[in-house]
Amino acid sequence: MRLNRVGITGGAIYLALGLLWVWLASPPGPAWLLVAWFAAVALVEAFIPGEANQVSFARAHLAAPAFVYSVSPGHLGLLAVVLAVAGLSDLVDGTIARRFHRPSTLGGGLDPVVDGVLLGGVAIGLALGGIFPLWLAVVIVARYLLPAIGGLVLIYLHRRPELRHTLSGQISTALIIILVGGICLFRFMNQDATNVVVGAEVVIPITTLATFVHLGWVARRPVTTPEPG
């Protein structure tokens, strides 16, 4: 892969916004770690083509403030806002890809990676703060980690994994964002979040299992020639 103008531009914009957030918000924790995260993501982004993929990278950058707010109980309202923005970016990147007829295998592989980084970090942070059940955080991490491991196994077996969006995966991610964001919002407003937590404990494992079954079924089928990009 080589440097890409769209990727460099997108990474520079996100890096500037990240540095501005660190300066204005003075978030808890070492500032240099946050700056290093934004810089590292921007560096990777510089090699990734496509406008839709740049929108997807917003979620990788948002992982830093999301994790910081998830381990700070007084910032759960801001975490809910970050998750709402992340969910919006998930809608926008797909819309851009379809609008300009540029869906790609790269985008199909990138989305679950950035979603896993964002939502896995949030789930772990909330579990560490006692806001979220630890076992459910493990389920969310596994939701994104196990398919990635499965893809690596297929590559090791000299099979090309089919990188594309699946309906079950999109529904699973959307519900995780909605339910986790809802828990944060209820706790921030000092409202009883028991029903939302119970809903998450039922819905997230079911949709995760459905995603695994769907991905396993897709992996059994012959791989068609992927689109470039």
Locate predicted features.
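A feature for the membrane-embedded catalytic helix bundles of lipid/isoprenoid biosynthetic enzymes
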Residues: 1-53, 113-229
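Membrane-embedded alpha-helical segments that form the functional core of polytopic membrane enzymes
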Residues: 32-37, 42, 54, 60-106, ...
